[in-house]
Amino acid sequence: MKILMVIDQFYDANNGMTISARRFVQVLRQHGHDVRIASTGSPELLADGETAYLMEKQTVPVFDRLIASQGMTFAKTDEAQLEAGIAWADVVHFVVPFALTHHGIRIAKRLHKPFTAAFHVQPENISSSVHLGNAHLVNSGIYHWFRSYVYQDCRHIHCPSALIAGELRRHGYTGQLHVISNGIDPDFTYRKQPKDDSLAGKFVVLMIGRLSIEKRQDVLIDAVARSKHRDSIQLVLAGKGPRRQALEHQAEKLGLSVRFGFYPKPELLELIAMSDLYVHTSDAEIEAMSCMEAFACGRVPVIADSPKSATPQFALDRRSLFEAGNSSDLADHIDYWLEHPEERIQMETAYAELAKQYNLEACVRQAEAMFEQAIAENEAQEEAPHA
């Protein structure tokens, strides 16, 4: 298949959605498909011989700094470039529900090209940025806006989890919902390695993710401060985002040594291998690739049981779930796993085994089936006699 992937940000892999899209594209190409990208970027970012349809960055007055701090970029639609890419493709896959996708769907319909769309942007990711993450009417309004702006025209919608598929159905989305995990990179497998000098002798608690309001790293910092073993714990928050300064101030006020940093993949693999426990405190999550990668490496997760997060689906028992937002309950869970190393080692193997269900190769095969269905339905519609 000739597949056009339309995504505002592809060549700057500094957020989970972009990293996931790049992995999908890599495997699709390994399967023999010709995949091209429509995205922001410049020619020097392309691989030798790569054809792409490049857009300029769209600036958003007032909110530009906030958008950048979240690791996001919006594309300024170049209609000619976008139409050239869509005309070339057998099928078009739209990744995010913003202006580039809105314009692309209009072009695809005009050219009678089949297309699919993914739902990767949870409304709470947007509303939390302006401290309205728990405002039901605001989040419902964003679901409605996404539906009217993009998804009402989509017959096939990729949902990374059953939770988000349920939310879409509840908010009146009528397309066929394909629940397909983003998948786990095969490089993330069970591993352990000796701790470096800075971590030696410490019980290392790790969380990976954007430092933003809805991720709730503040709960984890408070939980470590409440732990009976706080002096034995080294907390590592891997990620970047607008909340870093506030989190650093919180840790300093509580007298905790917290390591902050954004780690390239090789360093991240080493960090996971040196960690003892993985914690995921997020209130809102469509799937949580970082948590999946951690338990694929054999780290036992402790996950917030938020109703707006799909991540609790990965908990094998209640020992891996804590009450969302409750730092005292989280502290109890951290202490439990620290005090029961034999149980933790036993569960490490169980979680690494669980990860095999989310094999990236299998997930891409499911996406290919969705693309093929969209193409077949489009061909049947084109061949049908018109009144």
Residue ranges, per PLM feature:
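Membrane-proximal helix-turn-helix segments that form the acceptor-binding/catalytic region
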Residues: 110, 123, 138-156, 171
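Acidic anion/phosphate-binding donor-loop and adjacent secondary structure
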Residues: 184-201
